[in-house]
């Protein structure tokens, strides 16, 4: 029965996002966001015995409900004064609507809820929060992009995403701050090219799925649990290490491709100041990925009797190997195809 209800909620979750991105009015977009929210809450609260999960789902609901109420208020004002037109909005209404969408997506300076909610979720639900749940708000943001307003959010997202992950001992919080940093890059890509941010999001989602599935299989939630995999196959440890480097955007891995495209675009437009800041802050995120990798490779602990056996089954192993191959060698394959063509 629980599996059937979860499947229904999962279908309505996808339906809500599709309603939002295909809507031609703000009210229809709001309805899609609400369908998405009310479908995701039961999926988040999959383990009722875990109080941290219940707390996270409550925090998520309160934050999203607050954002939705402000968004509905702004939409009513828009319908009353401007006949629900996307283009005929004054700055006050526009900033109010876009601020609520930034709050829903977890971008700085409205990011306060995101790491705390991530901390209480399972890896699969956290993956949905980092990827699928951002699609609808980002699509709505791309319809109305205010340069000066979003420049502040871009810089703050990259800054907080980089510095916030430095002192973390929780892998889920580290991934949350990493997501905030990547969200800054997506907004930066959106500033110049609508297709560019979609490409960035697609590759980021692929890399996140690859690394999160590995964390989920080994039940890794904190840095000290990484010592458990010191007795693992060295190839598995190497795959985690390379995936982290790819997520950090280090060449020649696939994660470098979207950043490369954004850098190229910004260089052509002469926006060197924001480009320099973005690259410098990304180096900090690469540092805490390397710090996580150091725990995997350099530190060795004796196996304790209380350590749980991992459930890294063959089926999931094959899926992970495919995703890892794409993540690690994707950029090389794209370059080879480009050279052939």
From Swiss-Prot:
EC top class named in words: translocase
Listed GO CC annotations: mitochondrial inner membrane
Keywords for this protein: Electron transport, Membrane, Mitochondrion, Mitochondrion inner membrane, NAD, Respiratory chain, Translocase, Transmembrane, Transmembrane helix, Transport, Ubiquinone
Main location: mitochondrion
Topological type in the membrane: Multi-pass membrane protein
Catalytically driven reaction(s): a ubiquinone + NADH + 5 H(+)(in) = a ubiquinol + NAD(+) + 4 H(+)(out)
Transmembrane intervals: 8-28, 61-81, 95-115, 145-165, 174-191, 195-215, 238-258, 270-290, 321-341
Biological processes per GO annotation: mitochondrial electron transport, NADH to ubiquinone
Ribonucleoprotein among keywords: no
GO-annotated molecular function: NADH dehydrogenase (ubiquinone) activity
UniProt keyword annotation of Manganese present: no
Family: Belongs to the complex I subunit 2 family.
Name of this chain's protein: NADH-ubiquinone oxidoreductase chain 2
The species this protein was found in: Anopheles quadrimaculatus (Common malaria mosquito)
Gene name of the encoded protein: ND2
